[in-house]
Amino acid sequence: MKNILSLAAAFTLLTAPLYHANAAVSVSGSTSVSNVVEVLAETYQKSSGRHVDVQGTGSSSGIVAAKNGTSMIGMSSRELKAGEAAADIQQLVIARDGIAVIVNNNNPVENLTRKQIKSIYRNEITNWKQVGGEDKAIVVVTRDASSGTREAFEKILGLKRQVNGIPVTSISAGAQVANGNGMVKTLVANNDYAVSYISLGSVDNNLLKALKVDGITASDENILSGQYSITRPFILLFKNETDPRAADFIRYILSDKGQSIVAEQGYIRVK
Amino acid sequence: MNTCTKTNDSGISHRHTPKPDRLGTFFHLVFICCAMVGVVSLATIAWFLFSEGLAAFRQAGVIELVFGSEWLPPALFGIFPMIAASLISTLGAVLTGVPVAVLTAVFLAELAPKWLADIVRPAVELLAGIPSVVYGFFGLVVIVPAIEVLFNIPAGNTLLAGIIVLAIMILPTVITISETSIRALPPVYKEGALALGASHIYSIFKVLIPAARSGILTGVALGVARAIGETMAIIMVMGNAPAMPGSILEPARTLTANIAMEMSYATGIHASALYSTGIVLLIFIVLLNTGLLYINKKRVH
């Protein structure tokens, strides 16, 4: 009898999360967007008591998840490509984000032009001396091929070229590749001559600094006014006939409360 | 013999008919099932890799994929630089790690005073239990900056950093297996050598190590497998640039790193190309193991 009871208890414990997950709003996609949506989900849960399940899986898989219904809401940190949009999917911009070009705090360089950044990533400028810094080789750090940040960075700066009619990256193959924001930060913080790019909201000012681009500081005001040019939208994707629980969470994100959380996290509010 | 059979026929035959040995059959089956777990897993993995990866081979062509030097998904899928990086990092790790490991094993088995062996052996065994992400972190904060200073290069995330980390990672496997095989030698080998007037060191290099060759090579084979399959530590210290490294002081991306870095996002033909990277890796491991087995057999005979 005792055994049966404990078996039943174990079974309940094992299946409880399943039941819980079914009742929750599921959100998955871009790791950059999930940073802010996780915070929104926490505060939403406190005020409404409803659970939101957030998973950072990358923009590409977030878009797929929204289309095939694996998640109620998908997250993307880049505009959808031509083949990715679908008639029954709505897109909603919940915030804007600046992509900061970052260097180590010990690097004297403060400003780069868009053209210089592009040349550095194409391996045409290889020494800091050429852009007003020390006589040291530039260590170029980029993200892995399918990161939303990389996709947006390439698109905004025109770091694309055609191979066999397919658009591919023109970032030099010799650049170091980091597979996440955390690793980008570690690499740049530990190397005086590294340069990389990262979501403005994730810049840690103790170890690395965001460069001015064309003389414009990467700040919220400059992004809002449109002066700072390397920006991207944070997009939520959901089906036309949205689950009411998901719709409620989306309303919360667009509310004044939700948008001020977006601003607190270092991103730019859209309302 | 005949009389015996007759007695059997006449009355007490039931005592002598062999009872079906159910327990024996049962355990026989259990043993077979256990032995099949590994084989079935391997077959499933291989089948899965081939069914997913063939699309990329079909679209890009085997030659283009294996010998192409540009990795530009979704247009070009050349993995030759990664094959080179995997082979160079593994070879480098074996060349630096194995001598150290074999000498350590000899030291532990033959030369070390008991108190010192009692410190070294647990330390080596502990090394085997450290997760690879910790090795990677150690490489990132200790080895990478050291390489920057030693060679005066801007970034220490290089093939060399990967080789050093891998060399340390294969130590415990090679040391433990080599030491066991040296200890397992019959004492007469050493006694005979010493009786013939050979010095202790001479008998170690001319008698003990050659005699334990088969065990040492098994250790090396496992070390090679560990080195070529290592992913996490390599991603952290090797820079992962998909370009052909010009020297061991340049960043490089191994086959395993390529799969791990892009698998979570990749779709369509890109994902398929990552599976075909896995196929190439599998083929390499099979070739390496076969090669080592062959050397092992040939030398022993």
List the predicted regions and their residue ranges.
Chain A
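Bacterial N-terminal signal peptides that target proteins for export
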Residues: 1-8
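A ubiquitous, low-specificity "background" feature that marks scattered single residues
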Residues: 8-9, 52
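Alpha-helical transmembrane segments and their juxtamembrane interfaces
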Residues: 12-13, 149
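C-terminal segment of classical bacterial N-terminal signal peptides
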Residues: 13-22
